[in-house]
Structures are given as C-alpha cells and as structure tokens.
Amino acid sequence: MVTFLTKQRAEQLVGTKIKNLDLYQRAFTHKSALKEYEQFTESFETLEFIGDSVLGFVITKFLFDRHESKQEGFLTKARTKLVRGETLAKIAEKLNLNALVIMDEKGLRNNWNNNPKILEDVFEALIGAIYMDLGLLHAKEFILRIYQDPKFVDMNSIMVDDNFKDKLMRHCQIQNWPLPEYRVAAHHEGLFYIDIHINDGFVSRGVAKSKKQAEQNAAQSYFQVQEELKNYNFN
C-alpha cells in the first residue's frame, strides 16, 4: 500500500517547519512511479544529486573542524566512510524512509523500497529537498543532528584509522626497516592469500576476496601478532 507524505511527517523528519511539501514528496518518488501516478511528474534523482553535494560539503567541514590536526589521508578516508552508500542506507532504514518511498506496483511487490541503493538515494534526496526548501543552514543542522546521534551513526568506530597498510609503512619507516612487500601466495576459490615480507622475511598473511582487502588484513594481522607477543608471559 502506498503511503503519501504528509506535512506533519515531513516536519517530524526535518525537525522544523517546512515550506514546500511537494519537494519532500519528490524526494521519495522513484522514477517507476511516474507512469503509475499522474500527480507525480519528477522523481528523486535531481534532488539526490543536490543532496549528495550538500552532504559531502557538510561532512567535510564537520571533519575538518573536529580533526584539523589529522592528516589529509585520514580525513579523506573518514569522509568516505561517513558518506558511503552502506552508511546512508542504514541511516535511511533507521529513519524508516523505506515506508515513504513511492514506486510502481512491481517495485513494491518486490520490496525494492528496502533496496540499499534506493535507501541511500532517498536519504540524499531528502537532504536535497531541505536545501532547496529551507537553505544550507537547515540542511546542515539536519545532517549534523543525524550524524552526531549514536543511534544513527557510530562515529567512534568510523573515526578509527583502519588503514593498516599505511600504519605498517609508517612503522617500518620509524624502525628504519625496508618497506613491506606484499606477495600473492595463492589465489584459490575466489580468495586471495597475501603474504607480507619485510627484509625478505615472512611476517604475516591475510586472506580476503579482493587483493586489496587481503593486503589490509595481512597488515592488520602483523599488528595483532605483535600485540599478542607483547602481552605473552614467556616465564
């Protein structure tokens, strides 16, 4: 059953009074609905494009203000985590935006309103609607209210620097060691087995479906082993 957006529901989502309800309804209108409902003439795609830009800008400024002393690489990685599709889809799910998506009968029957990509798009479109209706300040307030609420975003886990390859490279430089070499030990049944060698000596192995992730896992494994050795009682 299709649920059309009410002004009360829109204002509950945004957290303030709105001006143009049609903008918010468009934010939840999938292009498949345009043929089925003659009252809808535009889908969320344009608003999603605008919202994507606004979200990126606000999160970039937010990270810079809070972590100005951090290196650019860390800030870039943190921003990527905060605006990636997986994060946005989870936020949209927790906001119950799936119940507001308007699409054709086939889409609803196949539960496409719960598709992570569509949830990501409608969240960005909602931000776009707020920006177009109320301006950047209200869009920023909405975004930061969501992102600073641990119910929606686990900021602590996202802000952890989990680029273990970079960490290992810096570790080697501090120790005046040669840089680590990542060697493909095997590629079997869709899994990459990556070995790390430092100064021609094997130090750790990582396994994953992608070569890139296997390298990260191998670097992480190195630090895990070092931590275990440090805490081990040899007596």
Protein language model annotation of sequence segments:
Residues 1-235:
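Double-stranded RNA-binding/processing signature
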